[in-house]
Every structure is written in C-alpha cells, then in structure tokens.
Amino acid sequence: MLRGLTTVNFFADDLSAAQAWYTELLGVEPYFVREIEGVPAYIEFRIGDYQHELGFIDRRFAPPGQSAGGTMTYWAVDDVQAAFDRLVSLGATVHQEVREQGPGFVTASVVDPFGNVLGVMYNQHYLDMLGGSGE
C-alpha cells in the first residue's frame, strides 16, 4: 500500500521568502515553481541521496485548521550539531536542542521562519541501508 515517501510539503505565508531562505539553506534553486496569476503558489526542491522532493505551498491553499507542528519529519545529516547551528544562524528558532536518542541516533529540530517544524537526524540505520542501497 505505502510504497515510500514521495514529497514532504510545508506551508508558508510568503512563498518568495521561503524560496529564498531554503535556497540559501540547501544551496540549490527549486527545480519546479508553479505560479498563479504571477505569484508563486508552489515550489519544489530535490534534495538528498535519493533526490526526495521538498515542496512549499502558499498557505492560502492549506486545509482549514492547518497549523505548525503535527507530523515530525527528520532529514538525514552527517553532523546534527553543525546542521542545527546553521539552521539557527539562518533565522530558525529552536524547537528541540541536539539530543542523543540512543546509539546511532541523534536528533534536533527547529521551527523555520514560516512556522514549519524541521527535524535533522544522524541515523546509522539510514546509512547502513544506504550503503546496501536498502532497496
């Protein structure tokens, strides 16, 4: 039934600002931009080892009652502290400090300037699966 993660979508009130912030963070431009009446409505980046999709939707299209939080998504990083420090230096606020969750699992999370919770994680299991392609 569930074949795998396809796209992680966040909402933002100011999609142009979100595009600029995430372009700076990720070091790449979005590969896809959809505009409605000349205003960005959706942007999407491809990131990571498998080119996963990270999309941003103008909050005017959010379902009723949509707010920050909810599902926690963690992105694999090699150095959680360095990633956390960079996110904070770019203007994100601390959601959870760097924390060891067990052997081979270190996490941290921030709230981006657009109200989305963004987690980063060092996960040895992910690396083990990646090494063997995990497929």
Which residue ranges define each predicted feature?
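A cross-family glycoside hydrolase active-site/sugar-binding cleft signature
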Residues: R46, I57, Y74, E97, ...
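N-terminal beta-strand motif that seeds the catalytic metal site of vicinal oxygen chelate
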Residues: M1-Q19, T71-T73, N123-E135
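Membrane-topology and secretion signals of cell-surface/extracellular proteins
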Residues: E29, I43, Q51-Q66, N116-E135
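Vicinal oxygen chelate
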Residues: M1, G4-D13, V33, I43-G48, P63-E135
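Core segments of cupin and vicinal oxygen chelate
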Residues: L2, N9-H52
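Short beta->alpha connector loops
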Residues: I36-E37, D79, Q101
